[in-house]
């Protein structure tokens, strides 16, 4: 982790300490992304051939490569902390001590059980202490952790822990409302249900008034 930004390393360490890091095995050896994509493409070719798909067809010919590129560069890019967003934490010179809330954060992730889409929105709030964060950075942190194979409960807590670590305060709350395509597109095929998860820290957990203020913001979003 020595080549990572200080912020990325701190967040990773905090998640490991809380048992919230995504299950990852230690790499057998260092591998660059182009090699990783080449190997994934090869395995994807085998899977498609086992499904009796004709990869000589011009519609399917590049599919293994496209999937490999999508996995490494896009939907699973959050597995690599080298992609952790550059974070700007600013001294709280204005002494802001009221809740800051960001609603309707677009979130697209992947269910780690079936590798199909999780599609939803997040609401994130915090009460500043000594530092505030650029608002777009909250969206970027949500997107970073969404770009992994995930379960929604862990994703919610990872975002909370990352912001607590970076802002130096426990007063953070996160709520995610999402549709899981492992429920919508397979199995029970329920097209209308959604899952809501909430993780509360500091005053959001201990103060009923603060908690209710946050939950009202969440309900307003819904």
Swiss-Prot record:
GO biological process, one term: one-carbon metabolic process
Keyword Nucleotide-binding: yes
One GO cellular component, as annotated: cytoplasm
EC number of the protein: 3.5.4.16
Keywords: GTP-binding, Hydrolase, Metal-binding, Nucleotide-binding, One-carbon metabolism, Zinc
Uppermost EC category: hydrolase
Binding-site list for Zn(2+): 111, 114, 182
Transmembrane segments: none
Keyword Signal (UniProt): no
Catalytic activity field: GTP + H2O = 7,8-dihydroneopterin 3'-triphosphate + formate + H(+)
Pathway listed: Cofactor biosynthesis; 7,8-dihydroneopterin triphosphate biosynthesis; 7,8-dihydroneopterin triphosphate from GTP: step 1/1
UniProt similarity note: Belongs to the GTP cyclohydrolase I family.
Designated name of the protein: GTP cyclohydrolase 1
Organism this protein belongs to: Citrobacter koseri (strain ATCC BAA-895 / CDC 4225-83 / SGSC4696)
Lineage, broadest ranks: Bacteria, Pseudomonadati, Pseudomonadota, Gammaproteobacteria, Enterobacterales
């Amino acid at each position: 982790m020595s080549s990572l930004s200080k912020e990325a390393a701190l967040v990773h360490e905090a998640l490991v300490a809380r048992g919230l890091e995504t299950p990852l095995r230690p790499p057998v050896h260092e591998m660059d992304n182009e090699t990783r994509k080449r190997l994934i493409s090869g395995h994807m070719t085998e899977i498609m051939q086992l499904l009796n798909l004709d990869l000589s067809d011009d519609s399917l010919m590049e599919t293994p490569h496209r999937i490999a590129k999508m996995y490494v560069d896009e939907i699973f890019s959050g597995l690599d902390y080298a992609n952790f967003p550059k974070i700007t934490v600013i001294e709280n010179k204005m002494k802001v001590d009221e809740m800051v809330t960001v609603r309707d954060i677009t979130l697209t992730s992947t269910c780690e059980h079936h590798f199909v889409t999780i599609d939803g929105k997040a609401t994130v709030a915090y009460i500043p202490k000594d530092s505030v964060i650029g608002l777009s950075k909250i969206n970027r942190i949500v997107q970073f952790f969404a770009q992994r194979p995930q379960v929604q409960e862990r994703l919610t807590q990872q975002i909370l822990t990352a912001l607590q670590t970076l802002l130096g305060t426990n007063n953070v709350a996160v709520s995610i409302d999402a549709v899981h395509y492992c429920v919508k597109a397979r199995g029970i095929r329920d097209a209308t249900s959604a899952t809501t998860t909430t993780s509360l820290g500091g005053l959001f957990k201990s103060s009923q008034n603060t908690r209710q203020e946050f939950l009202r913001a969440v309900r307003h979003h819904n």
